[in-house]
UniProtKB/Swiss-Prot annotation:
Name listed for the protein in its UniProt record: ATP synthase gamma chain
Source organism of this protein record: Nitrosomonas eutropha (strain DSM 101675 / C91 / Nm57)
Domain of life: Bacteria
Compartments, record wording: Cell inner membrane
UniProt record similarity statement: Belongs to the ATPase gamma chain family.
A Pfam family annotated for this UniProt entry: ATP-synt
GO MF: ATP binding; proton-transporting ATP synthase activity, rotational mechanism
Subunit structure: F-type ATPases have 2 components, CF(1) - the catalytic core - and CF(0) - the membrane proton channel. CF(1) has five subunits: alpha(3), beta(3), gamma(1), delta(1), epsilon(1). CF(0) has three main subunits: a, b and c.
Keyword hit for Cell inner membrane: yes
Its job: Produces ATP from ADP in the presence of a proton gradient across the membrane. The gamma chain is believed to be important in regulating ATPase activity and the flow of protons through the CF(0) complex.
NCBIfam families: ATPsyn_F1gamma (TIGR01146), PRK05621.1-1 (NF004144)
Topology in membrane: Peripheral membrane protein
Keywords, ordered alphabetically: ATP synthesis, Cell inner membrane, Cell membrane, CF(1), Hydrogen ion transport, Ion transport, Membrane, Transport
GO biological process: proton motive force-driven plasma membrane ATP synthesis
Length: 294
């Protein structure tokens, strides 16, 4: 059995650790609320630009954007993997990376070549160790998604698809459900599907004539810009959801760590009291035995 001094030192060390985890829990709770607000505020813009993109895709008969054209055969796949820059958030990154790894193995078995864009340091490190070719990366986003930092890496993927280097593009991230639940998901980013191009504003309305736009000087540059902005909005929303998931998972992980530290302190305190009691009993026995011998 450890000495009383060793047990006291362990209790002191665990209490110091508990103070740190409680502080991190409170910080994560504050950041989680802000991340959830950013995630909710990003949704109206995403919905609106989706409706505009849907209108234009149905209205323009003289030009069809490459993002809307399905490829018959799939030989190259580009993926965007969204993870956090930091750890201490439970199994959040592990779950989404495991999901991506499973799909990479399936595509590899089918003879498809994989290239990846990494958003977040954890995903970048994992893909580098895995040996997958990383064509673009974004790290150091901080606590808020920054579109200016994301645009460059996303543009590399979009240009590769436009140049027929990719036949499919997917994105992996953690979808925020609630504080206690985050789900790793895979979504097809390109080509855009009917689900992407649905117009929520017209779902419950009677059929009417197709949308009619007059483009000056021509349709192509306008539609090109709208489609790129729509994809950027989808990526931004995924990053915002992943950040909200990250802070929620970190808060839950730190709370669990604080609770476990408390339980360990209680156990060590009980052991310390037993050890102290045994030492006192032994000392009294020695005194009584000495007195009896005299």
């Amino acid at each position: 059995m450890a000495s009383s001094r060793e047990i006291r030192n362990k209790i002191k060390s665990i209490k110091n650790t508990q103070k740190i985890t409680r502080a991190m829990e409170m910080v994560a709770a504050s950041k989680m609320r802000k991340a959830q607000d950013r995630m909710k505020k990003a949704r109206p813009y995403g919905e609106k630009i989706r409706n505009v993109a849907a209108h234009m895709s149905k209205a323009s008969v003289e030009y069809r954007h490459p993002f809307l054209i399905d490829r018959n055969s799939v030989k190259r796949v580009g993926i965007i993997v969204v993870t956090s820059d930091k750890g201490l958030c439970g199994g959040l990154n592990t779950n989404v990376l495991r999901r991506a790894l499973n799909e990479i193995r399936v595509w590899g078995a089918e003879g498809e070549q994989i290239e990846v864009c990494c958003i977040g340091n954890k995903g970048l490190g994992f893909m580098s160790r895995l040996g997958v070719r990383v064509i673009s990366q974004v790290t150091g986003l901080g606590d808020a998604p920054n579109m200016e930092k994301l645009i460059g890496a996303v543009k590399v993927v979009l240009d590769a698809y436009t140049d027929d280097h990719f036949d499919r593009v997917y994105i992996f991230y953690n979808r925020f459900v609630n504080t206690m639940k985050q789900i790793p998901v895979m979504e097809q980013l390109l080509p855009l599907t009917d689900e992407h191009m649905r117009d929520d504003g017209n779902e419950a309305k009677p059929a009417r004539a197709p949308w009619d736009y007059i483009y000056e000087p021509e349709a192509k540059p306008v539609i090109d810009d709208i489609m790129i902005r729509y994809i950027e909005a989808l990526v931004y929303q995924a990053v915002a959801e992943n950040m909200a998931s990250e802070q929620s998972a970190r808060m839950v992980a730190m709370k669990a760590a604080s609770d476990n530290a408390g339980n360990l302190i209680d156990e060590l305190t009980l052991i310390y009291n037993k050890s102290r009691q045994a030492a006192i009993t032994k000392e009294l026995s020695e005194i009584v035995g000495g007195a009896a011998a005299v």
